[in-house]
Amino acid sequence: ATNIPPHNLTEVINGCIAYIDDPEIELSGLMEHIKGPDFPTGGVIMGHSGIRAAYATGRGKITLRGRAEIVENKDGTQEIVITEIPYMVNKARLIAKMADLVKEKRVEGIRDIKDLTSRKGMKIVVYLRKGANASVILNQLYSFTQLQDTVGVIMIALDNNTPKTLNLKQMIQKYVEFQDEIVRRRTAFDLQKAEERAHILDGLHRAVDIVDEIIATIRACKGGMAEARQAVMDTFQFDEVQADAIVKMQLGKLAGLEILKIENELNELNAQIKNWKDLLADDAKVLAVVKNELTALRDKYGDERRTSIEHVSGEVDIEDLI
């Protein structure tokens, strides 16, 4: 099953735009924009190697920690203040696990644990005994509880209805191609509707000069709308679509047709039709629309990254060895 962690909208859109601007962009270039997963609960991702492996292959593991700070008190005691916990970790269970570790004496030096979470944000305070080593205790909490968690990444998506594991660039490529298709299909639909409306307006434009004759012909037909439509087609050489639009109009409305109003609408439609045809004939223009729409989405909904990424001592990327 797919398991793609949440990402930052601004970063992902910037990555998509970078790909549109340069389809030959490499993974390292994309990662300048897409730093890594970004969880709504914040936290700290430990190291870049797990992120890079996941983005390069479509599979990987990322180490995620809660955000904790060691606070020195005036009386010489220390506290561990936790303000963020890993994504999908249950706060109550985390605190209960910490308490169990204290009872079992697997972690020593903790005198109390309090949940001081409020509307202002999360806050779990671990009060330490005087002389306790806060750094050691914090590392023990990382090791023995879900204050440090592993997030698996499996980037599986449907490609032509076939499940495939995709790396980051492939995922972005498929998404941009999909957006390209959406713009083309939407434009083709709008173009078709505009051409259909323009065709009817062409008929109405011609009907203005002979409106009295058309009304007389319609009134002379006693066999209903079908007979009137056929009579208009035969007498005035309108096609079926145009004749149908004319016959369906109320006679009073037909008599009051204004040629200037028809011409204005027709001119607007013809300009739109030209623009849409030009767009569909130019791949670069279609991608420009995709880019502009993504930019508008980013500007409206984008926000700052919540999850930070810390370099781990001794971590070496493959590129560093080349």
Summary of predicted features, one role per range:
Residues T2-I322:
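C-terminal interaction appendages of subunits in large macromolecular complexes
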